[in-house]
Curated annotation (Swiss-Prot):
UniProt name for this protein: D-aminoacyl-tRNA deacylase
Subcellular location: Cytoplasm
Superkingdom per UniProt: Eukaryota
Top EC group: hydrolase
Function noted in UniProt: An aminoacyl-tRNA editing enzyme that deacylates mischarged D-aminoacyl-tRNAs. Also deacylates mischarged glycyl-tRNA(Ala), protecting cells against glycine mischarging by AlaRS. Acts via tRNA-based rather than protein-based catalysis; rejects L-amino acids rather than detecting D-amino acids in the active site. By recycling D-aminoacyl-tRNA to D-amino acids and free tRNA molecules, this enzyme counteracts the toxicity associated with the formation of D-aminoacyl-tRNA entities in vivo and helps enforce protein L-homochirality.
E.C. numbers: 3.1.1.96
Upper taxonomic lineage: Eukaryota, Fungi, Dikarya, Ascomycota, Saccharomycotina
Catalytic activity entry: glycyl-tRNA(Ala) + H2O = tRNA(Ala) + glycine + H(+); a D-aminoacyl-tRNA + H2O = a tRNA + a D-alpha-amino acid + H(+)
GO terms (BP aspect): tRNA metabolic process
């Protein structure tokens, strides 16, 4: 499973000219599910999203001291199979390593559930529309953008 974790001042997802999800301060996360991914990958990626320290200390003196939970941030996730694109041969991307729709949706939904379980009461994980063409907007804070692949986490 792959994730692009972006610290954001704001983010939104628009489908058919309608905003379906939006956040202010927090994370915008693109998540790709691979055909070899399992529940173990779900656990790993959800933990990275909620626990990675991407914000400075409260006094601003030290970088990388607080997670999205620590700063009271929101989380907006967007499914994105194109994170598994290969472009080694030719010009056309190859998506064979991405999970097919039903498997991808099941594991993606599990990631959302794990993140939701970690959020304090009253806060909900936001997401786009699985499989839809979406306009994803964000104001990247920093910019801070982290790539994570559960198969290459050693």
């Amino acid at each position: 499973m792959r994730a692009v974790i972006q610290r954001a001042k704001s983010g939104s997802v628009t489908v058919d000219s309608k905003i379906v999800s939006q956040i202010s301060h927090g994370l915008v996360v693109l998540i790709g599910v691979g055909h070899e991914d399992t529940a173990e990958d779900v656990e790993k990626v959800a933990n990275k999203i909620i626990k990675t320290k991407l914000w400075p200390s409260v006094d601003g003196a030290q970088q990388w001291k607080q997670s999205v939970l620590d700063v009271g941030g929101e989380v907006l996730c967007v499914s994105q199979f194109t994170l598994f694109a290969k472009v080694k041969k030719g010009q056309k991307p190859d998506f064979h390593n991405a999970a097919k729709g039903p498997q991808a949706k099941e594991l993606y939904d599990q990631v959302l559930a794990k993140i939701q379980a970690a959020l304090p009461e009253g806060r909900t994980v936001k997401d786009g529309v699985f499989g839809a063409m979406m306009d994803v907007a964000l104001v990247n804070d920093g910019p801070v953008t982290i790539q994570y692949d559960t198969k290459n986490d050693k």
